[in-house]
Amino acid sequence: RSLVGSEMCIRDRIEGGTKEITLLGQNVNSYGKDLSCGMDFADLLAAIAQIPGDFLIRFMTSHPRDASEKLFDTMARYPKIAKQLHLPFQSGSSRVLKAMNRHYDRETYLQKVNYAKKVMPDLVLTSDVIVGFPGETDEEFEETISLIQSVHYDSLFTFIFSPRPGTPLSLIHI
C-alpha cells in the first residue's frame, strides 16, 4: 500500500477513536522497497506520527538487515511512536547467521542495538533466538548466550530449530 493510502486508512481509524495503531509484517522495515515513491518505513512512521490525535504507534517485526539509524532516530523523535522494538537476532554466531541466510553478522546486529539504545535509553527491546541449528557447535551456542547476556533483552522468545516445509533445510534429517 502506498504512503498516501496507508496514511488515509490510519487517519480514518484515529478520527474514529482508535488509540493504538500496530503496523504488522514479517519485515516492516522493508516497506517502500517495492514502491517507486522513494519513501521507507521510517518515513511512513514519521508521516503517521504527525497525524493529529492522541494515539500510539507500534510495529513488528523488524529485520536487523533493514533496521537503520534513520528508523531509530525517527522512533526517538516522535512521542507517538512506542519505544519498543522487536529485533530478532536468531543466533549470536556470525557463522550460524550466514548459514541461516540472515544477511547480517553478530557485530552489525550489536552496533544497531547499541545505537538504538543510545538514542532511546528507555527502549523496550525484545528478540527471537533459535538454538540447535544444524551444524551449530557448542562454542557457537555459547556465542549466543554471551550476546543475550550483553544485550539485556526485556523479553526473549526462544525456539529450538525445526525445519520448515519448502526450505532447503527441510530436506535434512535431524
Can you say where each PLM-predicted feature lies in the sequence?
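Conserved SAM/AdoMet-binding glycine-rich loop
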Residues: 15-138, 149
